[in-house]
Amino acid sequence: MKHLINIADHSAEEILGLMDEADRFREALEGREVKKLPTLRGRTVFTLFYENSTRTRSSFETAGKWMSADVINLSASTSSVKKGESLKDTGLTLASIGADAIIMRHPSSGAAQQLAGWVAPEGQGPSVINAGDGSHQHPTQALLDAVTMRQRLHLGADRSAAGTGFEGLKVTIVGDCLHSRVVRSNVDLLSTLGAEVTLVAPPTLLPFGVDTWPVRVSHDFDAEVPEADVVMMLRVQAERMNGGFFPSHREYASLYGLSKDRAAAMKKDAIIMHPGPMVRGMEINYAVADYDNTAVLQQVNNGVHVRMATLFTLLTNGENAGI
C-alpha cells in the first residue's frame, strides 16, 4: 500500500489489516507512562492543511511523534501558498526536501489523488494520506469510526477467516450527507465490510446520484432510530452552503436532530457517534452528547491509533518490528 486516498480503492482485507494494526498500537501503548515507540525514527512527515482542523491534524501529529517520526506542520495561510504557489509546486518542494509522507487536507475533491501523481510518479516518492478533500473522502475518519464500532459493539471477537464481524450491522447516518466527505468514506468502508447503511436527511441534503450508492435512504428519522445499532450524526456544513437548504435551524433540529426522546427510542446497546466538530443544540441535544452510549471521545482516541497504523503501514510496508 503506497497511499491512502480513497477507501473504495482498498479491499476488506486491507481495511481490516489497518484496523487490526490500530488495535496493536493501542495495546502496545496501554499503560506506558512515556508514549514513545521507535517505529518511524528517521522518517519525515509533513502535514499540509488548506482547511482548519482540530482532531485530524492534532491526531496525525501525535501519531507521528509517538512513533518517533519528525513531524513538520504547514498551513496554507503561513506558507508560500499565500504568495500564489500551486499545489503541484508545494508538493514537489516537500518531496525534494525529503518528505516520506505528506498528509493533506484540501477544499477541492480529488486534490489528494492529483498530489500523489505529482510527487510519486510510478510509485516512487512520498506517500500521500488524504486527510479530507472537499466533500469527497476522509479515509482515516471512516477507519477510526469502524474501529470504534468494533470495540463498543464487540464485533468480530470470534471472526472467522471469511467474515468481518460487520455483517448485518445497521448503521444510520443522519444529517448533511450532501457536503460530507465522512459519509462517503463510511459508506464505502461499511458496505465493503457487509454492514447495512441508511442515510437520513432532507432531500436537499442528499448527494446527487445517491440512488446508485449501496445504502437505503429515508427522510423519517423517527422511523429509523429504533432499528439502528449505530446512529451517526453529521454536522450541517454551513460554510459550504449559500443558504436555502432547509427553512430554519429550529426546524432542522426538530426533524433531524438527536433529541432526548429519539435517544431514548434507540436499542439498549446501540451507540451514538459523531465525527466532529459537534454543534450541540443543532444536530445533537446538549445532554445527549454526553450520554454513556455516546462514543465521540472514543472516536477521537482511536483516531491516534488509526493514524499510527496508517503511517506505519505506508512507510514500512508493515515490516518494521518496532512496535
UniProtKB/Swiss-Prot annotation:
GO terms for biological process: 'de novo' pyrimidine nucleobase biosynthetic process; 'de novo' UMP biosynthetic process; amino acid metabolic process. It catalyses: carbamoyl phosphate + L-aspartate = N-carbamoyl-L-aspartate + phosphate + H(+). GO terms for cellular component: cytosol. The keyword Transferase applies. It comes from the Bacteria. Pfam families: OTCace (PF00185), OTCace_N (PF02729). L-aspartate binds at residues 83, 181, 235. Its EC number is 2.1.3.2. Carbamoyl phosphate binds at residues 55-56, 105, 138, 141, 276-277. Pathway: Pyrimidine metabolism; UMP biosynthesis via de novo pathway; (S)-dihydroorotate from bicarbonate: step 2/3. One of its GO terms (molecular function) is aspartate carbamoyltransferase activity. Keywords: Pyrimidine biosynthesis, Transferase. Belongs to the aspartate/ornithine carbamoyltransferase superfamily. ATCase family. Catalyzes the condensation of carbamoyl phosphate and aspartate to form carbamoyl aspartate and inorganic phosphate, the committed step in the de novo pyrimidine nucleotide biosynthesis pathway. Heterododecamer (2C3:3R2) of six catalytic PyrB chains organized as two trimers (C3), and six regulatory PyrI chains organized as three dimers (R2). This is Aspartate carbamoyltransferase catalytic subunit. The gene is pyrB.
